[in-house]
Amino acid sequence: MTDSLPLLLRAARGESVNRPPVWMMRQAGRYMKVYRELRDNHPSFRERSENPDLSYEISMQPFREFKPDGVILFSDILTPLPGMGIDFDIVESKGPLINDPIRTLEQVKTLRPLEPQVSLPFVGEVLGRLRESVKNEAAVLGFVGAPWTLAAYVVEGKSSKNYSVIKAMAFQQPDLLHKLLNHFAESIANYLKYQIESGAQVVQMFDSWAGQLSPIDYDNYAAPYQKKVVDLVKQSHPDTPMILYISGSAGVIERMAKTGVDIVSLDWTVDMAEGCARLPNNIGIQGNVDPGILFGTPKMIQERIIDTVKKAKGRKHILNLGHGILPGTPEENAKVFFETGKNINNLISNI
């Protein structure tokens, strides 16, 4: 009986469900008081994300508080980098810093293939514990950064406003960049397989910075490597739903659907009805409520969620934000988001 499986897993597979499942990107994090208290005692982000007890606890915090339909591993897209020979740190309020940015062929040649069982055992442990804890009340989600976004961080050395260093590499030394992207695609595919084998039931690939690319460059530097990751994972795990999210994706939505993923996660700058019209019927849709709406009134939050769900009616839909929840969001408004999502049928029938 598939009815005993988590709602989010069934919906992501395209099965008929009685409402869209609901979870939030970054649902474990700074907006929650319990997270901030834990952070005060453990100020290192890498410790919080790489110590299995802390990562498990943080992953479970929103589940205990809000009972979302998905529980996502608390980690970071850069977590696998040290396993490939790239050290990094995450500085509070500044973001990631790569100690030795990758700029030469010699550096690319020294990168190691990722062996997640060896370098990331804590990830497997946390995913297994999450599955044990949430049982079928929620689906356990794993995630990775896509090759272009990982390359953007390791070439730039930090977050960037215009990505001029990696774009210079793309337009001056494309062969070098392709070698780096290919290395990441193979390693990230192995990492996703490891997450699935450890307990992840649905996985999401974040290509956060692919929205900085023109469509022609998306076709050259992002899409082929997204597709390579998907193809490699689907060879061994064809039934695990895969989601692709890009921030600022309005110009490449149709291209996202061609990578082989099961679900395209829309950001909030695209009208849900237009997003649905631009995607083939076999592709599921996740999103796409503006995270800023969670600073509004409960009535406004409800209205916006109802609008989003109604526009996605008839499609395989997972209710989510169009970006991660923002720091400073009132916790009670996050609760309104989850409760509205879970009570959506009653709310729509009463309109």
From Swiss-Prot:
Keyword field: Cytoplasm, Decarboxylase, Lyase, Porphyrin biosynthesis
EC primary class: lyase
Molecular function per GO: uroporphyrinogen decarboxylase activity
UniProt-annotated location(s): Cytoplasm
Similarity comment: family membership: Belongs to the uroporphyrinogen decarboxylase family.
Biological processes annotated in GO: protoporphyrinogen IX biosynthetic process
Pfam families associated with the record: URO-D (PF01208)
EC number assigned by the record: 4.1.1.37
Catalytically driven reaction(s): uroporphyrinogen III + 4 H(+) = coproporphyrinogen III + 4 CO2
Annotated site (Transition state stabilizer): D76
Known function: Catalyzes the decarboxylation of four acetate groups of uroporphyrinogen-III to yield coproporphyrinogen-III.
Source organism: Prochlorococcus marinus (strain SARG / CCMP1375 / SS120)
InterPro entries tied to this protein: UROD/MetE-like_sf, Uroporphyrinogen_deCO2ase_HemE, Uroporphyrinogen_deCOase
Protein name per Swiss-Prot or TrEMBL: Uroporphyrinogen decarboxylase
Any single Gene Ontology cellular-component annotation: cytoplasm
Lineage: Bacteria, Bacillati, Cyanobacteriota, Cyanophyceae, Synechococcales
Pathway entry: Porphyrin-containing compound metabolism; protoporphyrin-IX biosynthesis; coproporphyrinogen-III from 5-aminolevulinate: step 4/4
Complex and partners: Homodimer.
